[in-house]
C-alpha cells in the first residue's frame, strides 16, 4: 500500500510519503540515502555553519535540500523524501543540527563489526553435566591429553572459529581428560566424560606443556617446584622424541643431574633458579612469543609489603615483572589478543598488555573471594573468572563490563569441598570442574551448522515486521528483545535487550513481547507485552519515546497505529484508544464499549473504514474506525446467523452453563466427592465447545461491498472463513487451509495487490494461495495463466501420485493452492511479504526467522553464522536459477513435497503404457510355462542347506579400528586385538554311509572263483554265477559280449602272479566311474593296483585311465569295463591296445605292482556305494 501524508511544518514544501511499492521509477529507487558515505569533513563543517545561520537553528524539508546541494550532495525527489524522514526523528518535520549529526552517527554504528558479535543468550546457558570421579579421594589435578595444540598459528586463525561442521568436535579430534587424586591414581576420560582406563603415578605439582602439531618447532615441557625454580626441557617431537618406547623397559627413570650433564642427547635442559621466592603457582610457555610466564603467590604482606613480582615474563635474557599485591594464583595468556589476564588472592581480575607491565589495562571487580581460575575466549571477546566460593563471572573484554554471574556450582558441589580444580578446553569450549564430582560446563558453544543454521532470538519469535522506509526487518521475541536486521546482507544492525521488564521481590524480570506495529510513516515502533504494558520506540537509537498500559496483567494481543490514534486490544476484552496528537498524548485513554464476552485474540484494520476484532470463544465484531461503534457481530460456529449487539437471556444462560461446566470439571479433577454430572449437561456442553479465532486479515484492495470477501478469519479447526465487512454483508464462504489433523493457521499475510494469501500453520507449514478470483463477483474475475504459475511455483507441476497437500484440495477449486512446504519445526507465529523482491519472511516458535522466495526457495535464517545470499531490495529473489539448499533441521523431517519445493528440483518420471490384451495373454502363457518348469526343476533345498556346521560369532556393530604406532621398537599387537572366549566345538556326527564303508570288507565286492586252474596252460578259468549270467540276457547285441576268462598271461606259479618280462599291455582293465584305488581279485591270484610302481622288467609303467572308457563299435576290438561294485568284465588280451600313443594316461597314474600279493585296503578299494552289485551291458555302463 502507498500512503500519502502532507505536513504543514514547512510552508514552502510538502512531504509526500512513498514506499518502495509506489510508482517511482527503478532508477530513482536504486539511489542510496546513505549520507554518511558521501559527506566529507569539509562539507560537514560548512553544513554546521549553515545550521547556525538558519533562523532558530532549524530548517525545513526544502531548506535542508538546498543546503545539501550547496555542498555538492544531490538526491532525486524520491530518495530525498526518504532521507528527510529518516533524519526527522522528532516527527515535527523540522531538522536541527543534533538530529542531523545523530543520523550520521547511527549510520556509522550500523557498520561497526563489533555490533554483530553481541550475544543473544548468556554465555553459560546450558545445564552442566555431572559425573562421579571414581577416585577414592578428591581430584587434585585435571588436564587434557591433547590431540591438537591450543597454540593455533596466527596464519590459521579465521572467522569460522565460531561454528563447526561437527567433525572437529568429535572425541577423536578433541583428546582425552586426565584426572589425578592424592592417592596417586590417574584416570583417563573421553571428551564426553566416559571412563577409559586408570593408572597409578606419582603426583607432580606444577607443569605445563607447549607443542605444535606440525613438529617443526621444539616442544617445551615446563616444570615448577616448591623452591621457586623453573626448569624447561626442550626436545624434538619427531618420532616421539625421548618418549619412544624401548623393548623390555616399561618405565624409564631420569636423574636431573644426568640431564644437565647432557647424558641424554634428546633433551635440552634450561634452568631458572630462584625465579620466585615462593612456590610456583602457575607456568606457561608461549611458542608464538618464545616467552616463559611464571607466577607465584606472596601472601606474607609484612615481608613483601605489597611490592612483590606476582608474575614474571622471561623472553631470552629479558625479564618483565608484573607487580601485583599478594601475587598471582592463576593467569591466562591470549596470544591472539596479546593480552594477559591474572587473578590472585586479592579478588581482582586484571587485564594486561603483554608488552606493558607497569600497569594493567583494566581491573575487573565483583568477586568476593580469591580467584582460582581465569580463561579467555578471544573469538567471543569474553573473560571468565572463578573465585574461591565457586562463583563464575563472565566479563566483556572490550567494554570491561560484567555480563553474567553463574552460581550453580554452589548448589552442585558441597560447601565443604574447597580444593576444586578447573581446566578449560579451548577447542570444545567447555570448562571442566573436578572435585569429588566431574562437572562439564559449556561456555558459548559453537553452532553446529550441520544441525541448524542458527537462531534469530534466544526465545520464540512472536512478531516479525518489515519497515518500508528503512528497508529493514524488525523481530520481537518472547525473550523481550527487539532486533533490527538488514535482510539484504544478513547483518544485525541494532539489538535492544530487556525492552519490557517488571520488578518482583527486588528482581528484574523480563516480560514477553506479544504484539508490535509501526506508525503510519514507519518511523517509530509500538510494542505490547504480556503484562499489559505498551511502549513506543525510536528503534534506530533504542530510545523509549512513550510508555502506556492497558489493564495490569492483561496480555496485549494486538496493536493498531493509525493517524493520531493508537488502538490496543488484549485479555481485557475491549479496545483501548490512546491519543497520538502532540500535546494530548499523556491524557487518559479512551475505552471502547465492552461487547466481547471473552479474551480478544486478534484484530486488524482497514484504513478509513473499520476494525475487526475476534475472541477466543469465536465472536467477531466489526467496528467503525472513526467513531468506535460496532455495527456487525457474528459467531464462527454459526456464521450465517445475525446476532444483535447485546447480551440476551439465551447467551447469558449459555455463558453461565459454560462457566458451570468448567467449574464442575475442575472440581471433579481435584476431588472425587462431587456428584456426577448429568448426561444431558455433558452432551449439551460438548455441543457448545467454542471454536477460537487464531488470526484475522483485511484485504486492503477490495471494496466494501456485499459481494466482495474482504476479511479472512482463521479458526483453530484449520478452516478459513471469508466475510464481507459491509453493513449488509456477512459470511460468504470457507475453505480448508491445512492438510494434517490438528493443524491450524496462526498467521496470515498478503501482497500489495491481494493476489496471494500467505499462511503459517501450527505445525510449521507455509502455504501460498491464489485468491485473485476468490469471493469476488464473476464480472470482475480475471483469466489465470496456469503455465506462468507453474514456472514460478514448482508445487503445481504434475507428479506421479498426489501428495497429502494436493489430496486435501483436489475437490477445492478456489482458492487454488500454489505452494506448500514445511518451513519450521515448530509453530509459525508471524509471516510477512516484501513486495518488490518477492520475499516471504516467517518467525517461528523455534527461535528463528527465515527468508523464502515466493516460490518456496530457502534464502537464509537471520542470525546465521554462514555466508549470506546476495539479495537486493530492487531485484526479484530466486531468479538466478542456482541450486538452493535446505535448512539442516528441515532436511531430516522433510516430505517429498517439501524437498521438491525448497530445492526447486523435480525428478523426471515415466508413465507405463497399458499393454494390449494379446500382450497380456502372451505374458500369462510364458509365466505359466515358467512356473511349471520351476515347480519341476527349481525346487528349494532342504534346511539346513549347509547341514550342521560351526557358526562364527557375530561381529560387533561398531567396527574396531586398530591404529598401530610404528615408531616404537616393540609393538604389542595382541593388546589391540579383540579375542573371543574359547568354547568347546561340537563333534559332528559321522555320516551313515561313511560308517558303512568303514565296516565293509573289500573282498565282498569281487566274484568268487568257481572254475579250476589249469597248470599246463597257465590260465585262470573263471565261471560267472548263474544269477549274474541271467542279468546279462538283455545286453545289446551290437556290442560283443565280454568274455568271462582272462587272456592267458604268463605266470610263474599257480597263484596267477605274472612273470617278469610279460607284457602288461595284454592284460589291461579299464576302470569307469570308480576310485583309482581299486584291487581286482581273480581266482587264487590277485592283481593289486597301486600308485606309481612300474612292473619289474617292463619298458614303461602300465597306467589305468580315470576317464570314462570309450567303447569301439568294431567287433574285432572289444573293450571291457566294470562299474563300481560290479563284477569285472575283461576283454581278450589280444585285442587290448597297450600303445601309449593311442591312449593318454590321466594325471593321476595307476600301475600294477608285481611284488604285491594282497591289495592294500587303504590304497585300493572298490566300495559298493550305489547298492548291490549289478551286471550291465557295455552300453548301459557307458
From Swiss-Prot:
Residues 1079-1092, 1103-1121 have a biased composition (Low complexity). Transmembrane segments: none annotated. Gene3D superfamilies: YVTN repeat-like/Quinoprotein amine dehydrogenase. The keyword ATP-binding does not apply. InterPro entries: EF-hand-dom_pair (IPR011992), Quinoprotein_ADH-like_sf (IPR011047), WD-EF-hand_domain (IPR051242), WD40/YVTN_repeat-like_dom_sf (IPR015943), WD40_repeat_dom_sf (IPR036322), WD40_rpt (IPR001680). Pfam families: WD40 (PF00400). SMART domains: WD40 (SM00320). Keywords: Repeat, WD repeat. WD repeats lie at residues 155-199, 323-362, 366-405, 456-495, 508-547, 595-635, 740-779, 823-862. Residues 1031-1182 are annotated as: Disordered. PROSITE patterns: WD_REPEATS_1, WD_REPEATS_2, WD_REPEATS_REGION. This is WD repeat-containing protein on Y chromosome. It comes from Drosophila virilis.
